[in-house]
Amino acid sequence: MRPTTEVPDTKRVIIIDALNMFLRSYTVIPSMNPQGLPNGGTIGFIKSLQKLCRDFRPHEVVICWDGHGGSEKRRQMNKNYKAGRRPVRFNRRMIDLPDDVVKKNRTDQQLRLHEYLNSMPVIQLMIDYVEADDIIAHVVKHKKYSDWTKISISSDKDFFQLLGDDSIWIWRPIQKLLLNGTMLLYNEGIHPNNYALARAIDGDKSDNLQGVPRIGMKTIKTNLPILVQENAISCDELFVHCRMQVKQKNVHKKLLEYQERVKGNYKIMQLYEPNISF
C-alpha cells in the first residue's frame, strides 16, 4: 500500500537550497531588464519563494547559500570532486552575449537577490568554506526546530539521508514530489539512514564521483537488503556482510574489490553539521 504524504499541522520551517533554486530560474526564465540583460534568476527565485510560502505556510524561512570555498573540504578528500563540471548555460538562445558578460550577469543577479532577501522576513545563511548542503543538515537538526516540521527545498538527492527523522521532509520542485522517510523507503527500497552508503556505491555523476562499476541503485536494492533496515550500516559492516555470504554474488565481489572507492565516496557524500549559530 502506497504511503500518504501529508505534512503534519505543526509549526513549519522551510529550508531552501538557494543556488539550486536560483539556477533553475536562471537557466529557464527569459526575462530581461531594461539594459537587455537577463534577470530571470532573481525574478524566478522570488516567485518560487512566494509560491512555497503559499503552499507550505511556513512560520520561518531559512535560505542557505554555498560559502566561498565551500567545496574545498571535500576536494581535499578527492581532487576530482565536482571537477570538469560544465558551465551553467541558458537552455534558450541568447542574443550574442559574451561569456564574460553572462558570468558577470549571473553574479550580479545573485548579489541583487541577496539584497532583496535581506529586506524580507527570512534568514539567510552563508559561511565561508561550508557548502549549503552541510548548512541545511545543521538547520534541520537544530534544537530550535526540534518540535517543528522541517521541509527542505531541493532537487538534490544528497538530502535523502536526512529523512530518517520523521519530522524532516523534502520537496523536490522539478519532480513536484514531497518525500518523507516512509515514502523514500517505499520508492527506493533503501532506508534513509543507509541512503548515503547506497549512493557511495552507485556514485554521483553530477559531482564526478565514480561508483562501483555496473552496480546501480536497482542492483543495490535487489541484492543488499541489509540497507533496508533502520539501523545505520557502516562501510566496514557492509564489507563484512559481503564476505559472510555463503554464495557470493557478483555484487558482493565487486563491493569487496572497490572497498576504498566506496569508503572515499561515503566520506564525501555524508552531510556534516558545521558549528554555527543563527
Q: What residue spans do the PLM features occupy?
A:
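Noncatalytic, basic helical substrate-engagement surface that gates or grips nucleic-acid strands
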Residues: 4-151, 159-178, 270, 275-278
